Regions:
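N-terminal secretory signal peptides
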Residues: 1-11, 19-31, 36-38
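N-terminal segment of the mature folded domain
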Residues: 40-165, 298, 304-306
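Ligand-binding cleft/hinge of the Venus flytrap
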Residues: 62-69, 152-209
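Hydrophobic residues within well-ordered alpha-helices
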Residues: 89, 214-218, 255
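Periplasmic-binding protein-like
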Residues: 127-131, 194-198, 205, 234-268, ...
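Short helix-loop capping/hinge motifs at secondary-structure junctions, enriched
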Residues: 140-146, 178-186, 261-267
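Ligand-binding pocket segment of bilobal, Venus flytrap-like solute-binding proteins
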Residues: 183-246
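Extracellular/periplasmic juxtamembrane helices and adjacent flexible linkers that interface
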Residues: 265-336
């Protein structure tokens, strides 16, 4: 069973009987005359996540519920901009499992005592999916966008979300910065590039999903975003093309258990399930790059000429302050 909620209030409520998707069992609908009987072993987990994996989790939750470990487990779900979701949990939004866009949104909860310091010591370093930063362009690529230099041409408008709220926006900025360095530019030249880039951004939405909707609505020539988000939009019939720049960053998406969970064993079972080949295949079918190599190898993804990681740029501990300090960071400086 799954219910979708928002950290700012109820957005939608959905009742999904865990195994019904797999076995066609009848669901008890809200308002039915017969009360739902809850077994003593049944538990509810709350998943608080960033916006883009919603479709994947709505497929995975009933599949987990159909496993022995997931028997009797129902879910409440909350999706939104990664930074906003992390701050909401820090401020008291109930959560058992958090799945965010980037590591600093977990680190915030570690500092608050809400996530164990050992959250990223497993073989996957706390990650559940990967992706890359890509460009979405209009059908036919009328602006002939091929690489980062094309985004600052005079006639080009670019969409990227707000880095104060969106994890995806931070990945985009680090991708641009790293690409310039990989091209042999200096940090001063990379900073000047970011300044020019933001001059081409007409609107900064709160999340990657909202930024995609703005692009679909006709604003902008290029959308910088998650490869998986762009692929999903194209699969759903949106008229866009995807460009993988020669230099881009590997996006690494973390997941963790919240210490205040009353059901840590089931929460861990859910995370363990998400790293099984079956679950990773579902992520791959939703255009994420699986973190389980044997599953990754069964998919065909475009391999950029130069793929770098956040570790290559000094890691998030350094980047969070250097780039995203709201008063003194590089992003604040180039947008002043």
């Amino acid at each position: 069973m799954a219910r979708s909620i928002s950290s700012q209030g109820l957005l939608s409520r959905r009742r999904l009987l865990g195994a019904s998707a797999a076995f066609g069992a009848a669901a008890v609908l809200p308002g039915a005359f017969r009360p739902l009987t809850v077994r003593a072993e049944d538990v509810t987990l709350t998943l608080v996540a960033y916006s883009t994996p919603r479709e994947a989790y709505e497929q995975l939750i009933p599949l987990f519920a159909a496993t022995e470990a997931g028997t009797g487990v129902t879910f409440e779900q909350s999706y939104g901009a990664s930074g906003d979701q992390s701050r909401a949990v820090e401020s008291g939004l109930p959560a058992d499992v958090v799945a965010f866009s980037l590591e600093p949104d977990i680190t915030r909860l570690v500092k608050a005592g809400l996530v164990d310091e050992t959250w990223n010591t497993d073989e996957y370093k706390g990650m559940v999916t990967d992706s890359v930063v890509a460009f979405g362009v209009r059908a036919g690529n009328p602006k002939t966008i091929a690489g980062w230099s094309d985004l600052v041409r005079e006639e080009v408008q670019v969409l990227t979300p707000n880095p104060l709220t969106s994890g995806g926006a931070r990945w985009n900025i680090m991708a641009a910065w790293g690409a310039l360095l990989k091209q042999g530019k200096t940090e001063d030249e990379a900073k000047e590039y970011l300044k020019q880039l933001f001059q081409h951004v007409p609107v900064q939405d709160k999340s990657a999903r909202e930024s995609l909707q703005t692009f679909i609505g006709g604003v902008g020539d290029v959308l910088i975003g998650y490869e998986n988000e762009l692929e999903l939009a194209r699969e759903n019939g949106e008229e866009l093309e995807i460009v993988i720049p020669a230099e881009t960053i590997l996006i690494e998406n973390p997941i963790a258990i919240v210490n205040t969970s009353a059901n840590k064993e089931k929460a861990q079972a859910f995370i363990d399930y998400l790293r099984t080949p079956d679950a990773q295949k579902v992520f791959g079918e939703n255009h994420y790059r699986p973190v389980v190599k044997e599953v990754l190898d069964t998919f065909t993804f475009v391999n950029p000429a130069t793929l770098f990681t956040i570790a290559d740029l000094g890691g998030w501990a350094d980047a969070s302050t250097k780039f995203f300090d709201p008063d003194n960071g590089i992003v604040a400086e180039v947008q002043a």
